Swiss-Prot record:
Residues 1-66 form the LCN-type CS-alpha/beta domain. Belongs to the long (4 C-C) scorpion toxin superfamily. Sodium channel inhibitor family. Beta subfamily. It comes from Centruroides villegasi (Scorpion). Transmembrane segments: none annotated. Has the structural arrangement of an alpha-helix connected to antiparallel beta-sheets by disulfide bonds (CS-alpha/beta). GO terms for biological process: defense response. This is Beta-mammal toxin Cv4. Its main location: secreted.
Length: 66
């Protein structure tokens, strides 16, 4: 599974500026999901890869980013 990492409180994606390989996104994806997850900056948000099927990613149901 793949997807954008999401803030559970506001429903927003984790923003990033440096597209492509990005240490911030990689670190956040691994902290949120697990150490074998991958992550990079895609369309100015952190995209996580190699996730388990039940991983919660953007968009959250009934939560819009404000």
């Amino acid at each position: 599974k793949e997807g954008y990492i999401v803030n559970y409180h506001d429903g927003c994606k984790y923003a990033c500026v440096k597209l492509g390989d990005n240490d911030y996104c990689l670190r956040e994806c691994r902290l949120r999901y697990y150490k074998s997850a991958g992550g990079y900056c895609y369309a100015f948000a952190c995209w996580c890869t190699h996730l388990y099927e039940q991983a919660v990613v953007w968009p959250l149901p009934n939560k819009t980013c404000n």
